[in-house]
Amino acid sequence: EGTRVRVKVERAGGKKPIEFDIVRGGVPFPSIRSHFMLNSRVGYVGLSAGFQETTADELDVAIKDLKKQGMEALILDLRNNVGGLLPQAIEVTSRFVEKGKTVVSVKGRSNYSEAQELKSVGGTTYEFPLVVMINGGSASASEIVAGAIQDYGRGLVVGSESFGKGLVQKIYPLPYGTGLTLTTARYYTPYGRSLQRDYSNGSIYDYFSHSDGPNGGEPADTAKEAVKPKGKPVTTAGGRIYYGGRGIEPDLKAPPLELTTLRYRLSEAAFFFVRDLTAGQIEGFENYKTPKQSFATVLKQGDIVIPDSLFSRFVEFAVGDKENGLTGANIESQASFARSRIREQLATARYSGEAGFQVLLENDPQVLKAIDAIPEARSLAKKIMAKNSDRLE
């Protein structure tokens, strides 16, 4: 770390490689990869990289920045968050749930097994409307956060059913580099729902097919049969009835953006087209050449527009590549999707990967559903504030 290395980079359309002097250093791996305003009032925080030692502090920094930009409501995206450190899940939940309330319970099989309630630690408590997004890739610590928010009616949960990983396990080392993983307890939401998905009537296929099915986290038909609710119904503070043993079921279900084979091919074509476009290699559109990224730029709606002339040139470019199997007709049938992917790649090339991701979310059906849920989330937040106010009087 701290030493220098010279790297040669060959770019599309470049006459010769470009040399850069780079100083070696640590590569940061934050829990929150992106945060920005979805519109003038709704902020977005993408907590996708697990729960690490800095997660709660990262959330505070992101929220502080969004509030400066006028945020009045927050969408916390826990989709594809596979979990992580339990104390950080408690800390994050504590930002929205008042001190002393149970966040998660740990219960063993018998009365002699370990049993404990982990409670909100207090500190900064945010009172703005909250929507939490989950999907079949949301597991463990992310389910603990979503479950507590849902049970207490502090916010709405939007998306598709979570993975359902709620086991407390210990690893006992064995010879030859092996080990035995022993399940000692289960996690339960504050109102008593088991987070662990019940596969007692299922198979190993059902377990692994849950998070990667074509329905964005909804179990395949065989898995649905295996996870029919068996426990007692639980009524949350928000007035909804849910069962344990199936992960977290969203308050409002929304399908993910479907990625068909055609859309994968269009995404690939958009990448190569914008690569040449920003290198100044698309004749007639040399003004799109981008020498370097402008990381400090805050992307706003309408910043990147794809004129019809540029889209027509993309169609020519894509059809000209005989290997991708694209035709003018099937590209036109997905014109809106293709334009979105071109905008995404342009935003990435001009500004940053975060800017490109922001463009992608503009047409994400689950994000759009979360935005539509803000008024209901606002009503829930007002009820919580009214209860807290009455308690103080």
For the regions a protein language model found, what residue spans apply to each?
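Cleft-lining beta-strand/loop regions that shape enzyme active-site pockets
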Residues: 1-177, 186
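Sparse, context-dependent recognition of short Cys/His-centered cofactor- or disulfide-binding micro-motifs
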Residues: 7, 17, 22-23, 27-32, ...
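Generic preference for flexible, low-structure residues
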Residues: 21-25, 35-38, 58-63, 92, ...
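Generic detector of intrinsically disordered, low-complexity, polar/charged segments
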Residues: 40, 80-81, 119-120, 156, ...
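Generic recognition of long tandem-repeat/solenoid scaffolds
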Residues: 45, 181-182, 243
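Stable alpha-helical elements in mature extracytoplasmic
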Residues: 55-62, 67, 88-92, 99, ...
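Polar, glycine-rich mid-to-C-terminal structural blocks
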Residues: 141, 147, 153, 160, ...
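Conserved functional hotspot residues or short segments at active or partner-binding sites
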Residues: 194-195, 199-393
